């Protein structure tokens, strides 16, 4: 914030290295920050259990990663972040590592329940964090893939309602599916060197 060179009126330079809290009155800046956090949408893909089970790419211990994930979820609760998923619980990678559709679903839901139990152990309310969880499944030509989403939703909703007393919003399992690269290779056996 030093003196400008002689002959420079400062136009165009005032924004360099200046943050919002320096440009705006503090109350307006805080309101924009608060409103942005309540409206922003997205997904954190930080499923440490999938990393350990399917990819073997953990750079942190499971305990540290769970604590970090719990910290992110607690921040979401404290700041009213309702439209951003704190974790995408991933079965896709488990399937790519060799699981069939049923095993993929079993491991993925088990991982989801592990996060639920961990967040509850930290004192979080099921109705505040469960809506911030999302799921990611693999899709292929096996007939079980046709129902994987419906089965997952039914199991999740019943467990969250009956075991954890979750409200309707918290019982909803949100997911997306991508085509399995592994299933595409099997269709072109002449090009598959395996």
For every predicted segment, state its role:
Residues 1-148, 163-178:
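Catalytic alpha/beta active-site cores
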Residues 159:
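Catalytic core of soluble alpha/beta enzymes
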Residues 156:
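Conserved, mostly hydrophobic/aromatic
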Residues 144, 184-194:
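Thiamine diphosphate
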Residues 180-182:
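Cytosolic juxtamembrane amphipathic/interface segments immediately preceding
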């Amino acid at each position: 914030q030093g003196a400008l060179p002689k002959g420079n009126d400062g136009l165009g330079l005032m924004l360099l290295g200046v943050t919002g809290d320096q440009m705006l009155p503090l109350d307006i800046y805080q309101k924009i920050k608060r409103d942005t956090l309540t409206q922003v949408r997205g997904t954190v893909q930080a499923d440490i259990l999938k990393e350990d089970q399917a990819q073997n790419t953990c750079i942190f211990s499971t305990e540290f990663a769970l604590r970090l994930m719990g910290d992110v979820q607690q921040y979401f609760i404290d700041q009213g972040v309702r439209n951003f998923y704190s974790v995408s619980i991933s079965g896709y990678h488990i399937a790519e590592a060799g699981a069939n559709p049923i095993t993929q679903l079993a491991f993925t839901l088990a991982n989801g329940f592990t996060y639920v139990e961990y967040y509850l152990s930290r004192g979080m309310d099921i109705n505040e964090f469960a809506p911030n969880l999302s799921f990611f499944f693999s899709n292929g030509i096996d007939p079980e893939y046709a129902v994987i989403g419906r089965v997952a939703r039914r199991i999740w909703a019943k467990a969250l309602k009956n075991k954890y007393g979750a409200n309707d919003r918290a019982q909803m399992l949100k997911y997306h599916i991508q085509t399995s690269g592994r299933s595409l290779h099997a269709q072109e056996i002449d090009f598959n060197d395996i």
